[in-house]
Regions:
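Acidic, glycine-rich flexible loop segments
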Residues: 57-125
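An ectodomain-focused feature that recognizes extracytoplasmic/extracellular
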Residues: 1-76
Length: 129
C-alpha cells in the first residue's frame, strides 16, 4: 500500500529534513496523497554529493538523537521510527535513498496494523545550494 514516489532533502548540517512523497493510494473509500516527513536528521550535509555511497544509523525513539518522523493517515500523524538511511548511486547518475524503519500505527489507534517494519527506496533530490 505505501510506496515511495520521490524524496526531497533540505536543511543544514546536523538538522536535515527528508520528505518522502508517496504514490497516492486508496484508503477507506477515498484517495490519499500523503508523505513521510523525517525531521531533525543528524546528517553532515544536505548536498547529495557529500552523502553518496554513505550509510547512517540512528537510534529509535525515545532516544534524544532519534529522527522525528511521521506519516499523516486517517486524520492522524503516525510516528515513523527510522534506524537506517543509505544514499546509493543510481544507474542514471542520480542518487537513491534507502530508508529502514517502523511505522508505529498503534500510537494513534490503527491497532489492526500494529507496528509495521518497512524498507523504502526511491530517487532523492536536494534543495541545498
Amino acid at each position: 500500500m505505501i510506496q515511495p514516489r520521490h524524496a526531497i532533502l533540505r536543511g543544514e548540517p546536523g538538522n536535515v529534513a527528508l520528505e518522502v512523497l508517496l504514490v497516492p493510494f486508496y484508503w477507506k473509500n477515498e484517495w490519499v496523497d500523503t508523505a513521510i516527513r523525517l525531521d531533525g536528521i543528524n546528517l553532515p550535509s544536505a548536498h547529495l554529493a557529500d552523502l553518496a555511497g554513505k550509510t547512517f544509523l540512528f537510534p529509535l525513539n525515545p532516544d534524544a538523537e532519534a529522527i522525528d518522523g511521521s506519516i499523516y493517515l486517517d486524520s492522524a500523524h503516525h510516528p515513523c521510527d527510522v534506524s537506517v538511511i543509505e544514499f546509493m548511486r543510481s544507474r542514471n547518475d542520480g542518487l537513491k535513498v534507502l530508508i529502514k524503519g517502523v511505522y508505529v500505527f498503534e500510537f494513534e489507534g490503527l491497532d489492526q496494523f500494529g507496528n509495521t517494519p518497512f524498507i523504502l527506496s526511491t530517487t532523492v533530490s536536494s534543495c541545498a545550494v
